[in-house]
Every structure is written in structure tokens, then in C-alpha cells.
Amino acid sequence: KVMDTEILHYWGDLHGQSEETIGTGSAEEYFNFAKNRAFLDVSGHQGNDFQITKKFWKELNEITKKYNKNNVFITMPGYEWSGNTSLGGDRNVFFPEEDRIIRRSSHAMIEDRSDIETDCTTANELFESLEKNNEFDTLVYAHCGGRYADIKYAHDGRFEKSVEVHSSWGTFEWIVHDAFEEGYRIG
């Protein structure tokens, strides 16, 4: 029975960045700190998509694979889809495994545009592309950062099962009200 199950507590930081995007220290240092200094159980790197080059995406996937140890320290490969609010706003995208396609909101700060055909310029395009490629194991949540997510404009409950209500950016009760007004089921 679920009621008889012991409640387990896990500590994690799912949204951090490194010097390759807008943070400090390398991505390697970020995961090393999360595991060996902060003693987290789970961690994810959410670099802004328009700053993640093909080279860094490959490197980031290699780092998450290296640090992921089942039942010890879980890493979640992913990125921050960083569309402007009028296009759906920030979404954190997490994959259950490495080497997935990064679908950027733009290549604004990336010179190499050889994979620009994978860009999704709106949150709805992101959800449609995940559906088209049968990536229903992808987890997306609406993020209230610099370009706050507009879940009234774009939402797909098959991927976006949660919204960010509180972070170091502040508390965002309005996003819960938006979800209820739209009849969304969120956790």
C-alpha cells in the first residue's frame, strides 16, 4: 500500500548554470560541487539554449553521463528553453538519458547554425516537436525566470506536469492561478 510506504527525502538542485552559459565555474565543477560539496542526491544543468553550442551540448551530456550513479547521485541532462514570454517563456527541459536533440528557442549567441532546423521558436513548437519525435519521456516545467513562462499561451500536460512556484527569483503564485483558470492539472 502507498500509505504504508516509508517517505524518503531527496535533496536536489535542478536548475543551475556554469560559465559556458551565465554561471560561474565549469560544468564539470558544477556537478562535482553538487555531488561532493553540497551532497545533493540529484542535479541538472539548465543552461540557456541560445548559448549552448553543439560542442558544449556534447560535453554536457558526457559530464552528466559520467556523474550519474544510480541510487547514489542522479544527473538529469537538459537545458533551459529560453523563449521570450510572448512566445511561451522559459521552460526547463529534462531528458531521462543523454544524447537527445536540443531544440533551441534561437541561435542568438551561437555562430554555428548548422543545426538551426531543430530550433523551436515557440513553446507550442517545442511541444509539437517532442510529440512528433515520440519523446513522451521528456519532462518540461514552466520556469519563472527572466522570461517568465506563459502557460496560458502554451502548455502540453503530456510533457509539462509541473510549474515553478518558488525559486531564488521569487514566489510566483500567479502561475498556479493561471493553471487553475485554464483547467490544467499540475503538480
Map each language-model feature to its residues:
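Extended, charged catalytic domains and RNA/DNA-binding interfaces, predominantly
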Residues: K1-G187
